[in-house]
Amino acid sequence: PYQAEVAQTDAEYKRSRCGRKTKLNDKLRQIILNHLRLSWSPGMIAHEFKLATKSIYNWLNQGKIEFSLNDLPEHGVHQRRNLDQRSKYNQSLGRSIEQRPIVVNRRNRIGDFELDTIVGPRGHSKAVLLNLIDRKSRFLWAYRLKNRTAVTVNEALNKFLATFNGPVHSFTVDRGTEFSGLVSLEAQYGIKTYYCHAYTPAERGSNERFNRNSRYFYPKGTYFEHISAQGLKTTLLEINQRPLKILDWQTPYQVMLTNLSKNSD
């Protein structure tokens, strides 16, 4: 498998480097290119291989690494999603994000989740991905849904709640009709839901960033009916095992595991 080959190449490079001054040779060029193709950012690569982030950008700008800057995970301005399904009555749905407590805003604990859906080709595909990301650890879950209705979303969330062995305190969502049924989960589980202001994806910043990165695995136009359960599992494994600067270069998996262990003590 491609990722296994990448891991083997990484290990060989780290053993051979042994404190030497970094020069861009063929082996290092291929390592950087491999990870860029896996949607790693230059910062992630620099930390993992003890390089200077600026050096990677310089090599890219100079054409020494053949990879377009436009294809970097965080490059450019993210366009607003078409919110055609946000009906006027949804503007008064539920509890506003303005009421979200400080402990959630500061990401002090696991169990506060941002939710969103990623759609396939409009008018041609009903299946979507439901994404849940823990605000503290940035750990991501995703479910393939047959459609984008509130009933189907609630079914997936009930499945998540039955299998996740950690705390679930809150959901933060946009005002899409697919999230209009979360009030029933609050009554059943005591999970509070906070609705963002209309047209403000930045209020779910973690989820929006992971949605952008997920497009590496599932480009626009993907028919989610055609993705396999194993394929989705592999994608989540790859995303959750990437070291993140915001986590002091730990992975979401490491942070989630550490916090779950603390909760079980």
Regions found by a protein language model. Name each.
Residues 31-59, 64:
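Extended, domain-scale alpha-helical bundle/helix-rich regions
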Residues 119-121, 125, 142-165:
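Active-site beta-loop-alpha junctions of metal-dependent nucleic acid enzymes
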Residues 101-140:
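An active-site-proximal beta-strand-loop segment
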Residues 3-6, 51-107:
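Basic, flexible linker segments flanking DNA-binding modules
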Residues 32, 45, 56, 116, ...:
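Mobile genetic element proteins and their domesticated derivatives, centered on retroelements
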Residues 30, 34-38, 48, 162, ...:
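Charged alpha-helix within mobile-element recombinases
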Residues 166-181, 199:
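Acidic/histidine-rich, metal-coordinating catalytic segments
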Residues 1-35, 48:
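Short, basic alpha-helical/linker "hinge" immediately adjacent to a nucleic-acid-recognition surface
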